From Swiss-Prot:
<dbReference type="GO" id="GO:0015995">
    <property type="term" value="P:chlorophyll biosynthetic process"/>
</dbReference>
<keyword id="KW-0560">Oxidoreductase</keyword>
<dbReference type="Pfam" id="PF01218">
    <property type="entry name" value="Coprogen_oxidas"/>
</dbReference>
<feature type="binding site">
    <location>
        <position position="146"/>
    </location>
    <ligand>
        <name>a divalent metal cation</name>
    </ligand>
</feature>
<feature type="binding site">
    <location>
        <begin position="114"/>
        <end position="116"/>
    </location>
    <ligand>
        <name>substrate</name>
    </ligand>
</feature>
<feature type="binding site">
    <location>
        <position position="98"/>
    </location>
    <ligand>
        <name>substrate</name>
    </ligand>
</feature>
<keyword id="KW-0479">Metal-binding</keyword>
<comment type="function">
    <text>Involved in the heme and chlorophyll biosynthesis. Catalyzes the aerobic oxidative decarboxylation of propionate groups of rings A and B of coproporphyrinogen-III to yield the vinyl groups in protoporphyrinogen-IX.</text>
</comment>
<keyword id="KW-0963">Cytoplasm</keyword>
<feature type="active site" description="Proton donor">
    <location>
        <position position="112"/>
    </location>
</feature>
<dbReference type="GO" id="GO:0004109">
    <property type="term" value="F:coproporphyrinogen oxidase activity"/>
</dbReference>
<dbReference type="InterPro" id="IPR018375">
    <property type="entry name" value="Coprogen_oxidase_CS"/>
</dbReference>
<dbReference type="InterPro" id="IPR036406">
    <property type="entry name" value="Coprogen_oxidase_aer_sf"/>
</dbReference>
<comment type="subunit">
    <text>Homodimer.</text>
</comment>
<feature type="region of interest" description="Important for dimerization">
    <location>
        <begin position="266"/>
        <end position="301"/>
    </location>
</feature>
<dbReference type="InterPro" id="IPR001260">
    <property type="entry name" value="Coprogen_oxidase_aer"/>
</dbReference>
<dbReference type="GO" id="GO:0006782">
    <property type="term" value="P:protoporphyrinogen IX biosynthetic process"/>
</dbReference>
Amino acid sequence: MSKEPPKNSREKTKNLLLKLQDNICKGLENIDGKAKFTEESWLREEGGGGKSRVLKNGSIFEQAGVNFSEVHGKELPQSIISQRPEAKGHKWFATGTSMVLHPKNPFIPTVHLNYRYFEAGPVWWFGGGADLTPYYPYLTDVRNFHKEHCNACEKVNKNLHKVFKPWCDEYFFLKHRNESRGIGGIFYDYQDGSGRIYKGNNKESKAYKESINIGELNLNWNNLFSLAENCGGAFLDSYQPIIEKRVNQNYTKEQREFQLYRRGRYVEFNLVWDRGTIFGLQTNGRTESILMSLPPLARWEYGYKAKKGSREDYLTKIFTKPQDWQNDKILEKFCKENNIFD
């Protein structure tokens, strides 16, 4: 089968991502049971527009945002040209759905999702992923999130998750803090079926080495469309069980303060390192929608140190470092012994 996009590629991906936005919003409203999303449609002067949906002050979610955008233009931003110089001089099209959820309860993790598609002349690619940021560590929650996304990837090809999991660890990393933003998930970018799966620049990374071992997979446009469809569809099953398990856990003022402190790391990553934020600002995107990912409240504290042996300590030392969450028996034993397994 041809690797070229079908003639209706733009319409097809747009409809997939609109449906993803709808399904997630309906699911989250059912889960929250109190608040509803408000929608704001917007137009971009240079071409295109989108629909931003935000839920505030719910029973579970302090703030939840689910954005859809479909934008096009003539001049490509430098961030794209530097990665794919052959796209220069072509009109471009980009569509995506992104989501960030900030729950009130510190025992329910923040979660992020983004699936996107890009075309410019002969150049096209899919990108996407989902990642989880707990504030209090529970290994079973982490495992459920990874399991659902692993299964979604393996429906397309059994080797994809072997690269996308470590690529996520690599991408969502705060270099200035030397720690991960959370416990990862999956991440992929610039997927057009050509070459090796890993398109990053770090030849020392686990994702790069796994990609070398696997070789070329020869995926086509339809395979990659199915990947976005499967992974987007896996989100609610990966996250809803965590909410149901944690929503009635009582928390202290100190635990809420720690959640806000760790949210500060989320802000730092999104404003300093995130390519999506940079792309949006470089292409004159809608600032309110681009910065929707930021939490409504966060805090910073100079020189904070968690008490040794506390849950906050385990979060900082173990759950902000890449791990083999599914298979590491030593990690499992440690979590069980220290009441951070389930």
